[in-house]
């Protein structure tokens, strides 16, 4: 099988040694207990992030994006069966326990898509923000609060002392998400896992929050795994992007190429389904069928074949490997012959 970790990146950050990723996910498989049976939710997921790189995970709901992030952060539900390898800075994440796991979580921060679902309504903002500093890094309470006030200022929240005394319900959705970003950055992480951080916000607030997140990521030199269902947003934010479908990665390449020159029929269909405000009376293009979860998808053939207009008998013969294309990776046995046609689909 081709190694997704060799896929080209748009940039090699200064000081990053080629072949020395900060995060290396290799052959990750996750099965969860569903209706009394362990069913697959991730299948052979492999990718790596170089220091300072922004890497996107794109796909529809249920494709496995968030589950991948939770596996990296060791936040999978009880009873999960995990195989494969997750290496962070050369350490086996699955082997970490106790103090080692707490230290790891200080170096890997996560921003969730719904801030209200991940804050305690009866705890003040200050307690929430400083908890990781106090418990994982043994920072004194007064110093932790001072750092929190400073970080609130960096995400555009004034009067930080007053905000620390408030409760989550006293803040707007956009302001609370800024608090989540500030909290994630307080421990000076090396890796930021951003799980659709603007989904619950209105369009204007989304743009403001994304600008803050991208600016601070660049300022602090963070590596970021950015999860989204929006192909255009990934192209604007990320150096490289992996497209996921039914628990598998189906394409990895430079983000700027995903729309104009897709390698996989699913990527082309996603790009073609986007609304175009420049066209009037334009019927939205929908992908036939419905998105499948990993345990619903065919196990012995291409998972996208039931919805793919380009599927042939060869697509039903086996689960395709991620194939090298010279400028990326694609899980489609017809990539080379379809390339021009897929570009037309994306542009339609």
At which residue positions do the language-model features occur?
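Conserved ABC ATPase signature
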Residues: 166-171, 175
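Short catalytic/signature loops enriched in Gly
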Residues: 18-21, 158-162, 252-348
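Conserved ABC ATPase "signature" region
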Residues: 91-92, 142-162, 271-272
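ABC ATPase NBD coupling module
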Residues: 77-81, 93-109, 127, 135, ...
